[in-house]
Amino acid sequence: MRLFLSLPVLVVVLSIVLEGPAPAQGTPDVSSALDKLKEFGNTLEDKARELISRIKQNELSAKMREWFSETFQKVKEKLKIDS
């Protein structure tokens, strides 16, 4: 029974796929595709800049940078003394 029902469904799906795009769905012109790509790039850039600024302004990241700087200075001083 399943095979009996699935074969007509398969034929309908294949006919729709093989029919091709409708005239209104024809290939879009290159300029609109480039405009969409440019818009996507701009929004991605804006989001990345916002994320970086949020990370820089975050209190935890500021404390981590400060701790890393202090630790690095201590290591540098120890290496200068030992050398």
Curated annotation (Swiss-Prot):
GO terms for biological process: lipid transport; lipoprotein metabolic process; negative regulation of cholesterol transport; negative regulation of lipid catabolic process; negative regulation of very-low-density lipoprotein particle clearance; triglyceride metabolic process; very-low-density lipoprotein particle clearance. One of its GO terms (cellular component) is very-low-density lipoprotein particle. It comes from the Eukaryota. Residues 1-26 form the signal peptide. Gene3D superfamilies: Apolipoprotein C-I (4.10.260.30). GO terms for molecular function: fatty acid binding; phospholipase inhibitor activity. InterPro entries: ApoC-1_sf (IPR043081), ApoC-I (IPR006781). Keywords: Lipid transport, Secreted, Signal, Transport. It is found in: Secreted. Pfam families: ApoC-I. The keyword Transport applies. PANTHER family: APOLIPOPROTEIN C-I. Apolipoprotein C-I is present in acidic (APOC1A) and basic (APOC1B) forms in P.paniscus, P.abelii and P.troglodytes and perhaps also in baboons and macaques. The two genes for ApoC-I arose through a duplication process that occurred after the divergence of New World monkeys from the human lineage. In human, the acidic form has become a pseudogene sometime between the divergence of bonobos and chimpanzees from the human lineage and the appearance of the Denisovans. Pseudogenization resulted when the codon for the penultimate amino acid in the signal sequence was changed to a stop codon. Belongs to the apolipoprotein C1 family. Inhibitor of lipoprotein binding to the low density lipoprotein (LDL) receptor, LDL receptor-related protein, and very low density lipoprotein (VLDL) receptor. Associates with high density lipoproteins (HDL) and the triacylglycerol-rich lipoproteins in the plasma and makes up about 10% of the protein of the VLDL and 2% of that of HDL. Appears to interfere directly with fatty acid uptake and is also the major plasma inhibitor of cholesteryl ester transfer protein (CETP). Binds free fatty acids and reduces their intracellular esterification. This is Apolipoprotein C-I, basic form. It comes from Pan troglodytes (Chimpanzee). The gene is APOC1B.
